[in-house]
Amino acid sequence: MATTSAEAKMRKPQKFATRYRNRCRLCGRPRGYYRDFGICRICLRKLAYNGEIPGVTKSSW
């Protein structure tokens, strides 16, 4: 979980564009971010496993 101060810091408008950091919309995690979904890999796995993301299925071959 991201700290409250880190989340508040990222909400403020940044002076430079390179300082912007993508964060998970659900938990605020800065790493393992999937742009297509806007969430981190851990939250993506949880939601996909529960069938809450349309079109995402467990692979099997």
From Swiss-Prot:
Keywords of this entry: Metal-binding, Ribonucleoprotein, Ribosomal protein, RNA-binding, rRNA-binding, Zinc
One GO molecular-function annotation for this sequence? rRNA binding
The cofactor binding remark recorded in the entry reads: Binds 1 zinc ion per subunit.
Assigned GO CC terms: cytoplasm; small ribosomal subunit
Q: What does this protein do?
A: Binds 16S rRNA, required for the assembly of 30S particles and may also be responsible for determining the conformation of the 16S rRNA at the A site.
Q: Per its UniProt record, what Pfam families does this chain match?
A: Ribosomal_S14
The protein's name: Small ribosomal subunit protein uS14
Residues that hold Zn(2+) according to the record: 24, 27, 40, 43
Name the gene for this chain.
rpsZ
Task: Give the record's family classification.
Answer: Belongs to the universal ribosomal protein uS14 family. Zinc-binding uS14 subfamily.
Q: Which organism is it from?
A: Endomicrobium trichonymphae
Q: What NCBIfam families does this protein map onto?
A: PRK08061.1
Subunit relationships: Part of the 30S ribosomal subunit. Contacts proteins S3 and S10.
Any GO BP: translation
Q: Which cofactor does it need?
A: Zn(2+)
Q: Please, which domain of life does this record's source organism belong to?
A: Bacteria
